[in-house]
Regions:
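Membrane-proximal envelope and lipid/glycan-remodeling enzymes
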Residues: 1-407
Length: 407
């Protein structure tokens, strides 16, 4: 499937979007009945709310220690140790006194991510029922379900990065450079490794622009559209200013000052962590008396918890075996980005800490998704092999995440 597609307007498929949102909400509802993680519930791990409150009080640090949160300690002050964009999103609500807005924001962001995945599929004229199915495969049929259920500080940033990355991809396809790169900058402000998506976005933007301006060269695109980069630049500059004001360096957002890492012999990132983390990334759980002993920390087999990885590899093989015409350059670009990001996260000390599944690898799902969508055949053949993958992903993540939250 080609990345080059003339822009055209369509009536929004409101009914199918509503059905999709109801399907996602139904899965959440089942989980919430067991876990009590309802979207109107105040969350204890609310670092981003505390940070927004501190900013509104005129303070960059939190004012005191919260021992149950992962806080950076710098010059005897306590700071949120995660990238700051989620607090940006919460500022308006905290300003009006809604200090438990994070849970509802997490729910809304989850649904928005599903909607934009659906919109990406519809951009390529995928039939609506198929589009709903593949959106569900990406979302509730993957380990996204673990991080999308509530607003704990470790999860809501990943949830936001997932949605913002999909939005960046969608607007790149639609030749909306300003929106695409602005949402990409927001995603980087949630999960820094999303910076790796930039080459893919620029490739999509270039092809979308050339579809309507075939004579333009790269320099022509820059001359015509450089002002669209302003929102992205403003967002990036805000990160740099905050980082410098707090930690004296434009790229330091605080994680290196977590006691967990300052006390570690190898620090936060080290190639010495890679072997064990790679093993966890592809290992199925051990068994005891025939019962799988699912781990609740530091990851497990990505093909079990996010079967869309299998789907993507199968569609690559199918396209090659059938000698179909597809965008080889983009396929290589997607694979390169995914591999680099997966390898990058394996040099991190914790691989996600306490959770079910392999949540760090969720950051790769949006790029794998667009790679899969570009390879979907028009005649829907081979679609049925995804059905058991979806049910395996849904069942494992639903049961596993429920057990994690009720422990």
């Amino acid at each position: 499937m080609s990345t080059v597609k003339p822009l055209k307007t369509k009536n929004t498929d409101y009914i199918n979007i509503l059905v999709l949102c109801l399907c996602v909400t139904a899965v959440f509802f089942v989980a919430w009945t067991f876990t009590g993680q309802w979207p109107w519930k105040s969350q204890p791990y609310n670092s981003y709310i505390l940070q927004a409150q501190s900013w509104l009080e005129g303070r960059l640090d939190l004012g005191r220690d919260y021992p149950y949160l992962e806080l950076a300690i710098f010059n005897n002050k306590y700071y949120v140790s995660f990238p700051q964009f989620p607090s940006y999103a919460m500022l308006p609500f905290v300003l009006i006194g809604w200090n438990s807005c994070d849970s509802m924001i997490a729910f809304a962001v989850s649904l928005l991510g599903a909607v934009y995945a659906f919109k990406i599929l519809k951009h390529f004229d995928i039939e609506s029922k198929t589009a709903i199915f593949f959106t569900l495969l990406l979302t509730v049929g993957s380990n996204w379900l673990m991080t999308a259920q509530n607003a704990w500080v470790w999860f809501i940033a990943q949830n936001m990065a997932f949605t913002l990355s999909l939005m960046a991809i969608y607007y790149a396809l639609k030749n909306k450079i300003g929106l695409s790169l602005a949402f990409w900058a927001c995603a980087v402000g949630c999960r820094p490794f999303q910076i790796l998506y930039l080459p893919a976005l620029l490739y999509l933007i270039y092809n979308a622009h050339k579809a309507v301006n075939p004579e333009d060269k790269i320099i022509d695109i820059i001359k015509k559209r450089y002002l669209t980069l302003v929102p992205m630049a403003v967002i990036a500059l805000s990160y740099m200013i905050l980082n410098f004001a707090r930690f004296g360096h434009i790229t330091e957002f605080g994680h290196n000052y977590l006691p967990e890492f300052t006390r570690s012999e190898l620090g936060q990132f080290n190639i010495g962590y890679m072997a064990e983390n790679l093993k966890n990334m592809f290992s199925v759980p051990e068994t005891q008396n025939g019962i799988w002993q699912y781990p609740y920390a530091n990851g497990m087999c990505i093909f079990l918890v996010s079967p869309i990885f299998i789907s993507y590899l199968v569609y690559i093989a199918r396209s090659i075996i059938k000698h179909e015409k597809f965008d080889m350059k983009f396929m290589i670009l997607v694979l390169t980005i995914a591999i680099i990001e997966l390898l990058s996260i394996t040099v991190h000390k914790t691989m996600g800490g306490a959770h079910f599944g392999n949540r760090y690898t969720n950051d790769v799902l949006p790029i794998i998704f667009i790679g899969t969508v570009m390879l979907l055949p028009k005649d829907n053949d081979w679609e049925s092999f995804n059905y058991p993958l979806f049910f395996i992903g849904l069942a494992i993540n639903l049961v596993g995440s429920i057990m994690f939250f009720v422990q």
